Amino acid sequence: MESSEGRTHSADLEAPARDVIDQGRAWIDEHEAELLEFLSELVSQPSVTGREGTHDDPESVVGSLYDTLEAETERATLDVQRVPDDDRGPRENCYAVLEGATDELFVCTSHTDTVAPGDDADWPGTDPYDVSVGTVRRSEPGAIELTVGGRREKRTIRDAYDRVWDRRDDTERDVLVGRGTYDNKASVVCLVGALRALESALGDHTLGGTLVHGHLVGEEIAQVGAKAMVSRGDRTGWFSERFSDPEGTVVVMDGSYGFMPAVGHRGLAWVTLRTEGESTHASTPHLGSNAVLETAKGLATVEEPSFRETIASPFIDDSLLGELTVAAGTTIIGGDVRRDREGRLERAGVNAVPDWCETTFDVRFPRWEAYPNDPEAIRAHLEETIASHVEAEAGDVDVTATVDPAEYFPPVALADSREAARNHPLVSQTIEAARSTVGYDPGVTVAPGVTDAASIYSATRLPTIVEYGPAGALSHEPLEFVERESVIDGAKAMIELTIRQLGVV
């Protein structure tokens, strides 16, 4: 096991950097109960995307976060940014900036929104927002057994989390169960704990560069908080107004595998295909043009080599991020079908040939030859390729394919391969911070989904770790959990990583 390497405790660093880290870690140990209580407080405030709230609403998660930062920090400058209102209500990004001796930046982000909890009955005590204490153990490779609230559940886990169990000596961990514990309020606590510890430990010293913490709204839907921070496209957001020519690095804090740095992720495009035909009475279907049927003809042939070759043509053979995948027909609707707010389906026009149909494609894609330049050409290629394919297979219908810019996220990659990524200065420092904290080399991974890094990197072009955070699982499922020890380890890892990136003067 790699855990036999032991904790290095930053032995490669010199004073005063090592002293600040040691004192900061001691502060975190002394305030462990307080930090865990803060996590419970954040979880108790529902923040499904759109309900994150504002700094002047103490009953919201953003208000609670801001109040804590205002009360418990002295050197950091706090700021908020109203994200443009939509039907989801007013909400704000929350920032903490600790000025350093130079313009070198270390930017760390988290997100404050969660997905919906689902059925309350699936959670301990029927309350997804009341943190429950349980245990988790790996029952066999690729599977865990979670015990909480008198229940025992066996679940499969991702390979990266499974590998973490191979690296550790213990076979069981205490966990905290609740909606948002893992995704992503534990990461918020890691950053707040690290900042408070850093202020306590710096004394007469200052950071060698400037630390920026951004707690962002709307990650789960369209990354609206990250886009507002960096204003992807025109660079007039909060970040670029303050740092016009930024130099530095970025770490996106998110529920992960125990501080195993994710060095990239594929891009994502949700393509909406609309087919319009001609309606007629169902007794004479030959007089119309069935939009649903013609759409189905196109969907039935997307696995053919000719389509695969065409849609994959701009992309490189990407050994880091992997190959392009196309999931066709992820949703489909046509004719006169409605779903009410309670989820009941209502049908009308069952005796009519449908004159319209919409279906969606989920496309995950690697880098292209000109990456990261010209991402809009890739978006246009996906639209044109899918529309042309369905149009060629279908009959007398009109076909259009569109990718909403809000649903288009370019890939992010730190290097050409995992081996090369390990040697990137930012990655090597995240590994050392983790090794010093948890006692083993966590390795590197590639994130399975997109994170706020897609928006942040495309606007700033700063080297970015796309995911780094505490260990846990079941992020979008009932019984979501984070490992208790990993929350505290996260604060320790982030204070060390901050010192490694910026130094102390």
Give residue ranges: language-model regions:
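Conserved hydrophobic/aromatic beta-strand scaffold that supports enzyme active sites
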Residues: N93-V97, V250, T272, T360
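Short glycine-aspartate micro-motif
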Residues: L105-V107, L176, P246-V252, T272, ...
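Acidic/histidine-rich catalytic neighborhood of metal-dependent amide-processing enzymes
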Residues: R168-G264
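Metal-dependent amide/peptide-bond hydrolase catalytic core
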Residues: M1-E30, S47-V48, S60, T77, ...
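Short, highly selective alpha-helical patches that border small-molecule cofactor pockets
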Residues: P58, V62, Y66, V188-L191, ...
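Acidic/His- and Gly-rich active-site-bordering loop/insert found
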Residues: S4-T181, S200-L207
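Glycine-rich, phosphate-binding/catalytic loops in enzymes
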Residues: W123-Y129, V230-R232, L268-A269
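Short beta-strand segments
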Residues: T109-H111, H215, V251-D254, E467-G469
